[in-house]
Amino acid sequence: TWARAAEEIAQGRRVYVVCPRIDASDEVADAEEEGVRPLASVEQVAAYLRSHPALAGVAIHELTGRTPSALKAQIMEDFSAGRAPLLVATTVIEVGVDVSEATLMVILDAQQFGLAQLHQLRGRVGRSSLPSLCIAMHRHELTDAGRARLQAFASTTDGFELAEADLRLRKEGDVLGAGQSGTA
């Protein structure tokens, strides 16, 4: 995966890496079980990628909801211009980001995201005629719902089909009450 990222960058393209957590302090109960790895965080993944041999010399930026607005603008400008062609981020990039040179997205611990989020994230790549790829990875054992969600995501890029799949998987919810699907 990281060699592929290096190939894209060598061709003048941009790469997103999306994580469900900002840093280790965001861990809730996902790493309490013995032997279960904590969910990927922007801070840890960026540090790992900066030391990865395939990405030697590649400028890597981090972007999260905690990043100050002025710095966010500079980070996105650097990413768009190719000065920092690899961006490790949370879902803060989900909407309002248009970088036509972005051709690869790696979503880590993809089971943590909903179908709509995954679809919005994938929409950040493939915004030009360049071939693009979105890789949704998971390192944890999947629940039946998580597996179904990722299978639906992998099966189509059609937003309407994904919305229908999401409705089938999560149901319509309790529109008059407080019951919801998912975890908080």
Protein language model annotation of sequence segments:
Residues P20-D23, S155-A184:
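C-terminal or mid-to-C-terminal helical accessory/interaction module adjacent to the motor/catalytic core
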